[in-house]
């Protein structure tokens, strides 16, 4: 899972060069692109992903879409698409996505797996609403601070965070 470089303003050509460089230096790599404009300052377009996959089909194998501009419309054979939120899991599966990649799955893995399995087994969806409700609670806070705060109830090591992060006070 590789995000484009942060802090610099650049366009598709520079993003293409960045990922091309990685693939050329590590040709055995299998890369899931990380589309998260809020953190990197860059938003992947369908065009640049299609070009990367065309030129590097064995290395560019998927995208985690936390910007949510791709997961509903990007269709590339043998290419994995993962929305970045539990609230997008069921809809994503319905339109051909592979699953989700989400930090909150550290907490919601069992529920997310049940939604995933029920979808593939064509069972009635009885856990999706609960899965989305749990995610929405975390969305009310700084996601990573909330995750550390929750997980620190079971394991002290999650209380160790570096500034600017802190545990929740509520």
Features from the language model and the residues they span:
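Aromatic/hydrophobic pocket-lining residues that form the small-molecule binding cavity
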Residues: 15, 19, 112
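A short acidic, helix-capping loop that chelates divalent metal ions and anchors anionic groups
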Residues: 6-9, 111, 160
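Hydrophobic alpha-helix-in-membranes signature
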Residues: 3-4, 82, 163
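Catalytic alpha/beta core domains of metabolic enzymes, predominantly
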Residues: 23-29, 36-141
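Glycine-rich, proline-tolerant flexible connector loops at the mouths of alpha/beta enzymes
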Residues: 2-14
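Short beta-strand segments at enzyme active-site cores
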Residues: 1-3, 32-33
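Conserved short secondary-structure transition element at the edge of the structured enzyme core
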Residues: 93-94, 130-166
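Short, intrinsically disordered, charge-balanced linker/junction segments flanking boundaries
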Residues: 168-170
